[in-house]
Amino acid sequence: MKLTINKNSAKWMQLPRDVLVGHGVLEEVGDVCRDLKLKGNALIVTGSTTQDVAGKRVSRLLEDAGNSTETVLTCRATMEEVDKLMEKALNTEATFLLGVGSGRSIDLAKLASTRLEIPFISVPTAASHDGIASSRASVIDNGKNASIQAQAPLAVIADTEIISAAPYRFLAAGCGDIISNYTAVLDWELASRLRNEYFGEYAAALSRMAARVVIENADSIKPDHETSARLVVKALVSNGVAMSIAGSSRPASGSEHMFSHALDRIAPKAALHGEQCGVGTIMMMYLHGGNWQEIRDALKKIGAPTNAEELGIEDKYIIEALLQAHSIRPDRYTILGNGLTLSAAEKVARITKVIN
């Protein structure tokens, strides 16, 4: 049988080449760079706290391996910071970047390295969201949150000893980000049926599997447990791979993420991204007619927020975010359609007990 190839169906899938997850794997950073033939000057992007947690060790280990290093401390994930990083990388003739942190540093290194067309390595110090292995970067551009296509990390080095020592709130937020895959995939399927949008079965299956693993193990995800950190990190890496396979964030970002981004815009003090996505997933699963109680119960077992009070956000902002969510990404069709009415928003929030 002759195989016919449709060139228009070809997709570019960029995946991490090396993924190290486990106790003490940070010590392997020099070997990873040798394996990947990364030589010369390394620019380490980190924060004031994560520099002490892992950044200084990464610098020492790379210098022991024969690399020279420079370190940049970041404070905000903005396009201005990306521009500064690019300038620093050019001035120091950096041949590769490392993002060492819980999210911001990784996203900045990811985007700067993409624009400079040089590799970068992701070194997460917490497992709070799936950006640690994805080809998307979340930054503030012109005062608004933006999710920008970028390159996937060439390697991910996730030391569970470090990650399990981070505040448990970050790990619980990571679980919320993973569990949100369920409604993201349902939205994707809906867009495929109603708008004839491309739907990737394999990416969707991988995304669902990651969410299912977290829900089925919700009872065993506890603070200070490296086994919990390992499980969550692997699921977050799976999320990143699913998005790379799909060529978009569709497998892991739908109406629940739009709700979270709307909260970021309007709430005086937003919660963690994964926390907001988890609460959003409860409500969006209700709109899909699914088992929203299972989502809520899993988040409760994990210790993640399930309502506005636990998020530290007033009820009125939850309602306003529901009303605005559909407009966050007008090109992305979800269960929100053209938007909820005020009465519908209040109904879903009250029935799911997100507000009182």
From Swiss-Prot:
Residues engaged in binding Zn(2+): D177, H257, H273
Cofactor binding notes: Binds 1 zinc ion per subunit.
GO BP annotations, alphabetical order: glycerophospholipid metabolic process; phospholipid biosynthetic process
Catalytic reaction annotation: sn-glycerol 1-phosphate + NAD(+) = dihydroxyacetone phosphate + NADH + H(+); sn-glycerol 1-phosphate + NADP(+) = dihydroxyacetone phosphate + NADPH + H(+)
EC number: 1.1.1.261
Pfam family, one: Fe-ADH_2
Intracellular or extracellular location(s): Cytoplasm
Statement: the UniProt record of this protein carries the keyword Repeat: no
Pathway the protein takes part in: Membrane lipid metabolism; glycerophospholipid metabolism
Residues that hold substrate according to the record: D130, D177, H261
GO MF entries: glycerol-1-phosphate dehydrogenase (NAD+) activity; glycerol-1-phosphate dehydrogenase (NADP+) activity; metal ion binding
Keywords from the named record: Cytoplasm, Lipid biosynthesis, Lipid metabolism, Metal-binding, NAD, NADP, Oxidoreductase, Phospholipid biosynthesis, Phospholipid metabolism, Zinc
Essential cofactor(s): Zn(2+)
Domain of life: Archaea
This protein's record includes keyword Acetylation: no
Residues binding NAD(+): G103, R104, S105, I106, D107, T125, A126, A127, S128, S134
Family to which this protein belongs: Belongs to the glycerol-1-phosphate dehydrogenase family.
Function per UniProt: Catalyzes the NAD(P)H-dependent reduction of dihydroxyacetonephosphate (DHAP or glycerone phosphate) to glycerol 1-phosphate (G1P). The G1P thus generated is used as the glycerophosphate backbone of phospholipids in the cellular membranes of Archaea.
Protein name: Glycerol-1-phosphate dehydrogenase [NAD(P)+]
Organism: Methanosarcina mazei (strain ATCC BAA-159 / DSM 3647 / Goe1 / Go1 / JCM 11833 / OCM 88)
